Curated annotation (Swiss-Prot):
InterPro entries: EF-Tu_GTP-bd, EF-Tu_GTPase, EFTu-like_2, EFTU_2, G_TR_CS, P-loop_NTPase, Small_GTP-bd, T_Tr_GTP-bd_dom. The keyword Nucleotide-binding applies. It comes from Bacteroides thetaiotaomicron (strain ATCC 29148 / DSM 2079 / JCM 5827 / CCUG 10774 / NCTC 10582 / VPI-5482 / E50). This is Elongation factor Tu. Coiled coil: none annotated. It is an enzyme of class 3 (hydrolase).
Amino acid sequence: MAKEKFERTKPHVNIGTIGHVDHGKTTLTAAITTVLAKKGLSELRSFDSIDNAPEEKERGITINTSHVEYETANRHYAHVDCPGHADYVKNMVTGAAQMDGAIIVCAATDGPMPQTREHILLARQVNVPRLVVFLNKCDMVDDEEMLELVEMEMRELLSFYDFDGDNTPIIQGSALGALNGVEKWEDKVMELMDAVDNWIPLPPRDVDKPFLMPVEDVFSITGRGTVATGRIESGIIHVGDEVEILGLGEDKKSVVTGVEMFRKLLDQGEAGDNVGLLLRGVDKNEIKRGMVLCKPGQIKPHSRFKAEVYILKKEEGGRHTPFHNKYRPQFYLRTMDCTGEITLPEGTEMVMPGDNVTITVELIYPVALNPGLRFAIREGGRTVGAGQITEIID
């Protein structure tokens, strides 16, 4: 029998489970797949298969992450779960696993704990738009008032970090109960998935955003002009479109006279395509790796920004010693690298390997930047940190 073709009929959303250690994130992930598997919407994944998360490398950092996929009646989900707290911090800050929304798991027996708070803060910093709360272990709490108290604390915590605490759905359940097939708790998992379907917004598709392509390589074709190659990050480009060439201090406009992919001529290229764009009236030495091509007026070069970063531990191949204010490493942004000076938050003397911190960066020249852009920090040929831009200063 022929293999079934993957039909992308439902919109795709990336989510994950976050929250304090031992509050039941992985158990809940297993419970979701188990309950949905009974309805034919998922492959059953055991706790052990999820907990035994494979190592992945992202921008030179090793992260343990489990990827699970399942469907609801309306959507297709890719769900990430991490075994350790440090893995979450790395995952969220480096964007190894982009989240369009998250389920924050909080044990009703404990209430919000330090990592509950830290994960909500991280979700805010890296612009996860909305969270859904799953109060776990409710089968172990007899006192209705206790549940109300924990729910109130969670709403206050969400509001404190600028989430919509008043309207965020909070589901009271038991992940273990659902995993063991107790109907009451299975229903709560379905209720949770309904909340996720309705509360977490569909992400804008990259194709619908304005055109942007970081330049990876440049060459000239005799008699035809200059070609810039790269992977289109967002948007669509048509033959005849005007583009802006930004970065490295030089800005210029041009018109795309040809779009090539795998040596074939196309009418257009779209987000995700690796293409070569033929540019009118551009000399080969006016454009180089690290610049970006974009729709005119969409993005400006900047040199100062705020960012949330994770600094690698010695064991991860990072620095052996802390760094101080005015540290000047290399920043790798898209396809370019540029020296930048780090300013630490007031009251922070130094940053230790293994820390995550909010920093201000001043690059030595302006480059095309936007909030949410991921980057690596390197020094002497090795990655010492990774992060993402949270705010452009100028």
